[in-house]
C-alpha cells in the first residue's frame, strides 16, 4: 500500500491520516494536547488509548462521523495505564459490548480493580481535581481483558 502524507481535518476533534488511521482529540487539559487513535479496516475498529471518561463522547462522535457502530469496535489497546491514556477504558468497555481490552500484564490488575491506581491519583491531585480531570475510574471485568507482555 502506498502511504499518503496528507492529513485531513474532518471536524474539530477528528483527523484522518489516511489508510484507516484516525486521531481523535481527547479533550484532555486543552485542545490538541492528547489524542486517541482509531485503526479502521473493513468496518472493524481498534481504539488505541482511551483518554479519560470525558473523552468517551468524542470517541462516540468520531465513530458516528465515520458511519461505524459500537459493535464495530473489536479491540481497545492501552499503551500504558496513566489516566490520561487509560482512564476512560472502563467507560468505553461498557459502551462497546463485543470489545476486548489489551493491556500490559502489569496493568491488568489495575483495570480489574482500579482502587490502588485511583487512590494514588487522589493522593497526588486531591479528590476534587482527580474527579474534574479524569472522572471516577470504572473497573473492567477480567474476562474482557487480554494480558500482553514483551514481544506480544
Predicted features by range, described:
Residues 1-15:
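Basic/polar N-terminal segments that are highly enriched at the extreme N-terminus
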Residues 11-66:
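Conserved beta-strand hairpin/beta-sheet module of binuclear metal-dependent hydrolase folds
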Residues 22, 102, 145-148:
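General small-molecule cofactor/ligand-binding pocket signal
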Residues 35, 58, 88, 113-114:
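Residues at alpha-helix caps and immediate loop-helix transition turns in enzyme cores, especially N-
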Residues 57-103:
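Active-site metal-binding motif and surrounding structural segment of the metallo-beta-lactamase
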Residues 106-110:
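Short histidine/acidic/glycine/proline-rich micro-motifs that form metal-
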Residues 111-152:
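Metallo-beta-lactamase
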Amino acid at each position: 500500500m502506498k502511504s499518503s502524507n496528507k492529513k485531513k481535518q474532518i471536524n474539530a476533534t477528528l483527523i484522518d491520516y489516511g489508510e484507516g488511521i484516525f486521531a481523535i482529540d481527547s479533550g484532555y487539559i486543552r485542545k490538541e494536547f492528547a489524542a486517541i487513535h482509531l485503526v479502521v479496516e473493513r468496518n472493524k475498529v481498534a481504539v488505541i488509548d482511551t483518554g479519560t471518561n470525558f473523552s468517551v463522547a468524542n470517541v462516540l462522535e468520531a465513530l458516528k462521523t465515520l458511519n461505524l457502530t459500537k459493535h464495530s469496535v473489536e479491540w481497545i489497546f492501552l499503551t500504558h495505564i496513566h489516566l490520561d491514556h487509560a482512564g476512560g477504558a472502563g467507560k468505553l468497555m461498557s459502551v462497546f459490548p463485543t470489545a476486548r481490552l489489551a493491556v500490559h500484564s502489569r496493568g491488568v490488575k489495575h483495570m480489574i480493580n482500579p482502587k490502588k491506581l485511583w487512590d494514588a491519583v487522589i493522593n497526588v491531585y486531591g479528590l476534587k481535581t482527580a474527579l474534574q480531570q479524569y472522572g471516577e475510574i470504572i473497573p473492567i471485568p477480567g474476562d474482557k481483558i487480554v494480558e500482553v507482555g514483551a514481544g506480544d
